[in-house]
Amino acid sequence: MTPNRASNQAGYSLVEVMVVLAVIALLAGAAALMLPSGTPAAQRAADRLSLDLMRAERAAITSGDFIGLTVTGEGYAFSRFDGETWQASEPGGLRAVRLGDEVRLLIEAEGAPAYWFDPTGVNGEARFVLDDGEHRVTVAFVNGDVRISGEGA
């Protein structure tokens, strides 16, 4: 009796199974990247702002210049005081930040810049509120420390 050739070739090889598993893993990874992060937009913006506040304070101290933060229609930007006027720049690598359409930055200050960092490191207190319509997060800059509080914090 001769063995049936068709039965020897039935099923899938290990290589074929591994390729299918790799494709499934890639698709699952791509789908996971498309899901929302779960962190409210106001919280993400507050985290970014708190880091930028600390970097701006450090840039003012190391450069010996006053560094200003100006609230723009889209977010916020930094500038440097040249002794007479505020000049738009990227002091210490601080770039303008666009918060997106869903987040508003509120600060109780008038004029431009809304807040500035003293090169001596002695800075006043400031409170920034970020609101995305559902969550409201406050970033407080007090004595060189940054504190985040509010919904989603």
Predicted regions: what is each one?
Residues 1-7, 26, 30-50, 54, ...:
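N-terminal helix-rich module
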Residues 1-21:
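Glycine-centered recognition micro-motifs in short, flexible terminal segments and loops
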